[in-house]
Amino acid sequence: MALTQTKKQELISQYQAHETDTGSSELQVAFLTERINQLTEHLKANPKDHASRRGLLQMIGRRRGLLTYIQKKDQQRYQTLIGRLGIRR
């Protein structure tokens, strides 16, 4: 369920902070959100796939940690990011 190269480039162009940004916290959250959405759809079709469910929970935890970090650093950036990604938190 990895992201394709074209999807990664699309996310980078949408969420990068500057021209050479490829790994900022915002981008990491965007990547994780996309993978979480893909995995959620997979689990709807395959409810007994417990290994994938565990991976999903790990990704959600990692995203939660990054969002907490962004929120502590800059509340405005945090609000903008969750609004753009459509995350309720």
From Swiss-Prot:
GO terms for molecular function: rRNA binding; structural constituent of ribosome. Gene3D superfamilies: 6.10.250.3130, S15/NS1, RNA-binding (1.10.287.10). One of its GO terms (biological process) is translation. One of its GO terms (cellular component) is cytosolic small ribosomal subunit. Disulfide bonds: none annotated. Keywords: Ribonucleoprotein, Ribosomal protein, RNA-binding, rRNA-binding. Residues 1-24 are annotated as: Disordered. One of the primary rRNA binding proteins, it binds directly to 16S rRNA where it helps nucleate assembly of the platform of the 30S subunit by binding and bridging several RNA helices of the 16S rRNA. PANTHER family: RIBOSOMAL PROTEIN S15, BACTERIAL AND ORGANELLAR, SMALL RIBOSOMAL SUBUNIT PROTEIN US15M. NCBIfam families: S15_bact. This is Small ribosomal subunit protein uS15. It comes from Microcystis aeruginosa (strain NIES-843 / IAM M-2473).
